[in-house]
Swiss-Prot record:
The gene is PAT10. Disulfide bonds: none annotated. The chain crosses the membrane at residues 34-54, 66-86, 207-227, 241-261. InterPro entries: Palmitoyltrfase_DHHC (IPR001594), PFA4/ZDH16/20/ERF2-like (IPR039859). Expressed in mature embryos, embryo sacs, cotyledons, whole seedlings, hydathodes, guard cells, sites of lateral root initiation, root tips and phloem, but not in xylem. It comes from Arabidopsis thaliana (Mouse-ear cress). This is Protein S-acyltransferase 10.
Length: 340
């Protein structure tokens, strides 16, 4: 043991220095997320690298038609770039929206109230717990955020029933607390392990573009692999490796293609994965018929809200609106673009 210690001490010092310079490596969750990202990038490089390594005709084709490989490399780079953009994007946290509302409301208050709020904002937990806790201080009026959230629910709703039991913030409709991020997410869809972040209101469109580019890249790469196998006979071990990669690629393509179709349907109907899967467990959606999409405003407006970044909070529809949306479409409705 005494012989190993001199060798272990430099290693421990190097490890401590690495953790000091890279704090993300000291957190097991962030470390595993970083390793998954590196594995995904490495997998992309493996698929394109084997073609360059094994297929001499592919290299010659690249020299003859540089535009072909140029377009492929452009798509390859755009896909990885979109992956990192989506991974680093915010899904739309309630605490951020609450801070924006409180700051906008503070502009219309007198200076003394504003200074008190700025002093209390130094600790986010104080702002959320003290002002939002109407149960402990019944005489204190609700915060601007609390008023905004209450307006999104039917009259008579208690603010206590809308408060998250984990981060103690008032939740608008379509909000859920993510235990991986330890925050409440607006229009929560799901927590993506491969991206290391939640998919929510503010990055659902980025996520859709990523899986769209990934699907296109998989199809293009699959075509190149099939073209490689259809050429002149090659050594069996090369064909075995290519066939193995081709099977993995085909499985990946099926997965991302189904994911693309599924999320396209969600966007067109203004739904989320959580609302679709856990519909019966959400109190305000429990009694709504399954064929009714309570937050849908028509295909055109749903697309506009997603593509143009219209991050408005959705209010619960009234009984009249639900009845109107549950009515089946007729030919006249189609001509009037009621579905849009």
């Amino acid at each position: 043991m005494g012989v190993c210690c001199p060798f272990l001490q430099p290693w421990d010092r190097a490890r401590d220095q690495c953790l000091l310079n890279l704090p993300c490596l000291s957190d097991p969750v962030r470390r595993s997320s970083l390793l998954l990202k590196l594995a995904l990038v490495a997998l992309h490089l493996v698929f394109i690298g084997f073609l360059f390594l094994f297929d001499a005709e592919f290299i010659e084709k690249t020299k003859r038609d540089p535009w072909y490989m140029g377009c492929y490399i452009l798509l390859f780079s755009a896909t990885l770039l979109q992956y990192f953009v989506t991974s680093g994007s915010s899904p739309g946290y309630v605490v951020d929206a609450m801070r924006d509302v409180c700051e906008a409301s503070a502009m219309y208050r007198n200076p003394s109230t504003t200074s008190i709020q700025h002093a209390s904002r130094k600790s986010e937990s104080v702002v959320v717990n003290v002002e939002g806790g109407s149960a402990s201080c019944p005489r204190r009026p609700p915060t601007p955020w609390g008023k905004l959230v209450l307006d999104l629910y039917p009259p008579g709703t208690s603010i206590r029933n809308l408060t998250c039991g984990y981060c103690h913030v008032e939740q608008p409709p379509r909000t859920k607390h993510c235990h991986d991020c330890d925050r409440c997410v607006l229009q929560f869809d799901h927590h993506c392990v491969w991206l290391g972040t939640c998919i929510g209101q503010k990055n659902h469109s980025k996520f859709w573009w990523y899986i769209c580019e990934e699907t296109t890249l998989c199809i293009w790469t699959l075509i190149m692999y099939v073209d490689y196998l259809s050429n002149v006979a090659k050594p069996w071990w090369k064909n075995a490796i290519i066939i193995l990669l081709l099977v993995i690629l085909a499985i990946s393509l099926i997965f991302v293609l189904l994911l693309l179709i599924f999320h396209s349907y969600l966007i067109l109907t203004n739904q989320s994965t959580y609302e679709l899967v856990r519909r019966r467990r959400i109190p305000y959606m429990r009694n709504i018929p399954g064929r009714v999409h309570p937050f849908s405003r028509g295909i055109r407006r749903n697309l506009y809200n997603v593509c143009c970044g219209n991050y408005n909070l959705d209010s619960l529809p009234t009984a009249f609106e639900l009845e109107d949306r549950s009515r089946p479409y007729t030919c006249i409705d189609m001509l009037k673009c009621r579905c849009c």
